[in-house]
Amino acid sequence: VRLEATSEAATAETYAPPAAAGESFDWFSAWYPLRPVSFLDANEPNELRVLGKKLVAYLDPTCKEWRVLEDSCPHRRAPLSLGYVQKDGTLACRYHGWAFDGKDGSCVSIPMSVDEAAEKTACASPRSCATSYPSRVEDGILWVWPTAGADGLLASAGAPCATSLAREGTLPGEWGMVELPVGYAPALENQFDPSHAEWLHARYDAEGQLDERANAGFVAMTEFSVREGTMQKDGFVVEHGGYNKSNVGVSASRVFTAPCSSRSEYLDAKGKKYLSAAILYAPTEPGRTLMFTKFQAHQASAVQGAGARKVSPADRINSLVTAPATSLFDFYVDNFTSDPKLVRVGLSHGTPPGSSAYNLGDQDILAMHGVEVEMELQNKPWKQSYYLPTPADAGVSAFRNWMDKHAGGKVAWAPGVVDDASKVKSEAEQLDRYHRHTKHCVACKTALSELGVLEERCVAASKYLLAGGLFLAVTGAAFDQEAPAIIATCLAGASLVGAEKVRDMQHEFLSSVPRRGVPKPKLW
C-alpha cells in the first residue's frame, strides 16, 4: 500500500495479517554479525553474545581462521573466554586446562586424567565436547549462525550473509560498531524513521549554526511506502522522498534483510547517487543491541547533519597554544607505546574529534530508551501505544508489521533467556561508552591501556622532578644558582598538568558524563 499525503491527514497505521504456515522467520536460521574483524583481538579469546547465547571467538593460529564456540566449558561450565589460545590451534579452559578443537568443539586434552587411556575415553565422550557454531568472515565482519551441530552446518552452508545480498555491492571503508543499551525493536524503529534526524540531531548539522531549539530546515515527507510485493518473512523494502531542504529532491530505498541488515540508497533528482548507508543490527541480550555502520556520501550536501561542529576562533587559539604538547604526545605514541598504529586507531575512535560521534549516539539512546521504558510501562500493543498519523511514520509501521506478521512480534531468545528484566537504565548506564564500544574494540582497549601507563609515568616524573627541584633549591641557594630549581619545579607542574589531561582522555573512552561539574552532558 502506497502512502501519500492527501487533503485528509495521511496515516501510517496499517493492518498486517498474521503469517501463513511456512512464512514465519526463524531467528536461529540466519547469519548474525558479531564484530568487525578489526575490532577482535587476534591473540586472545573474545567474549561475544547473540540472541542471549554466550559465545567465544578466537583466531586459530594454524590456519588463520576464526572459530566460534559456546562460552562454556563442558567440564564445570567456566567461561572459555577466560582461557587462552594454544599454538596447536586449540582453545584451553583456564579453570582446569581442558583443550578444545575450535572447528568442531571436540575435546583433545584433559590434563587431570589418570593416564592416556582414561583421557582418550573421556575425550571420546560427546559430553566432553564444547558446542561449536558455523562462522565466516565476510565484508570485514565475523558472522555466526546460532544453530549448532549438523543442522546448523547444513543450513548455513548455502545461506548468504546479508551484506552479500546488496545489489549495489559492499561499501568502502571500515565498519563502525557500538552496542546500544536498548532493545532490538526500538533500535530498528529508529533506523526506519529518517525524519527524526531533523529534530533529535538538529544542532549538529555540518554548518554548526543552528539554535539548539531549531530544526535543520525540515520538509514534510509526502511519500513513504512499502514496495509492493516485498513484505515477506525475509524482509521488505521501503521507499521514501526527502525530509529536509538539502535532500528534498532525493528518492531513497531502504532494504531490510531480516533480521539484521538495513541498506539505504539515496538518489538525487537527476538519478545520480547521493548517499549510501549500510547498517547492521544484532540482538545480544534483552535490552542490548549491536549496531554496525558504514556510510558513503556521494555528494557534499549528503553530509548535512553528520555531527560536525564549526571550528570557532577559540578552537583555533586553543590549537595553537596546545600544539607543542600535541607534538610531544605524538612523539610519545610513536616511540614509547606497544603498538603505535593500533593506539592511533583507538585514539581516533575515543578522543576528539572522532569521539564527537558519541554525541549523536547519546541523543538517539536517550530517546530510544524513553520509548522502550514507556512501552514496557503501558504494556499495550504498539498500535495502541503509538499514534502514527503521517507518511513519515510509515517506516516504523512497516517494521512493526513485519515483526507481527513474520517474526512473532518479538525476538526469539536462546533457551533459558527470559526477557523479564526492567528496561529502565540510569542515565549513566545509557551514556556509558566503555560497554557501548571500548571493551569491544581491541584498538580502543589498547589505547586506553597505554594512556593509563602514560598517566602513571607523568605522575612519577612529577614526583622525581619536584624532589629534584627541592634539592636544587637548597643546594642552589648556597651557590646562588636558582634557575635549575625553577626549571625542575616548572617541569614537575607540567607533568601534573599532563597527567590530568591524560585522565581526561581516558574518560572519553569510558563515559559521556562529564568528568567534572554536573554529571550531565550538554547534548543540544
What are these regions (language model features)?
Residues P74, L91-R94, V108:
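Cys/His/Pro-rich metal-binding microdomains
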Residues S81-G83, C107-P111:
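Aspartate-rich (DDxxD/NDxxD/DxxxD) Mg2+/diphosphate-binding motifs
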Residues C93-H96, S135:
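Hydrophobic alpha-helical packing residues
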Residues F100-C107:
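Short metal-binding segments enriched for Cys and/or His
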